[in-house]
Amino acid sequence: MIKKENRNWRRKKRHLSIRKKIHGTADRPRLCVYKSEKHIYAQIIDDDKGHTLVAASTLDKELRETLKKTWNKEAAREVGKLIGKRAIEKGIKKVVFDRGGYRYHGRVAELAEGAREAGLEF
């Protein structure tokens, strides 16, 4: 059986190789995803300045009140919708999707679909 530490180490290694190719700018910032066992987090980052422009997670008060579980696909879709809504309010319409070394499957894919539903393009 593969140990969890080794799996996470391989994910970080994949993420570093992805980050060599993906770079967020002011015109098209980077939508970065991180997931833990119980929560999922998303940030929109301008890499030129090194600033987080918008952030959302299952820990936000808006979502904690409505979500029954924070670790399922429905919660990830709601986080995607929330970050999309916040980005549109700030004038961000196009982003580069950074899956964080995770497979584009399950919660990561649901977050992306939720962000697309809210109006983000990537």
Curated annotation (Swiss-Prot):
MF terms (GO), sorted A to Z: 5S rRNA binding; structural constituent of ribosome
An individual GO BP term: translation
Highest taxon, organism lineage: Bacteria
Transmembrane regions: none
Keyword set includes Acetylation: no
Family stated for the protein in its record: Belongs to the universal ribosomal protein uL18 family.
Subunit structure: Part of the 50S ribosomal subunit; part of the 5S rRNA/L5/L18/L25 subcomplex. Contacts the 5S and 23S rRNAs.
Function recorded in the entry: This is one of the proteins that bind and probably mediate the attachment of the 5S RNA into the large ribosomal subunit, where it forms part of the central protuberance.
Identification of the protein by name: Large ribosomal subunit protein uL18
Provenance organism: Thermosipho africanus (strain TCF52B)
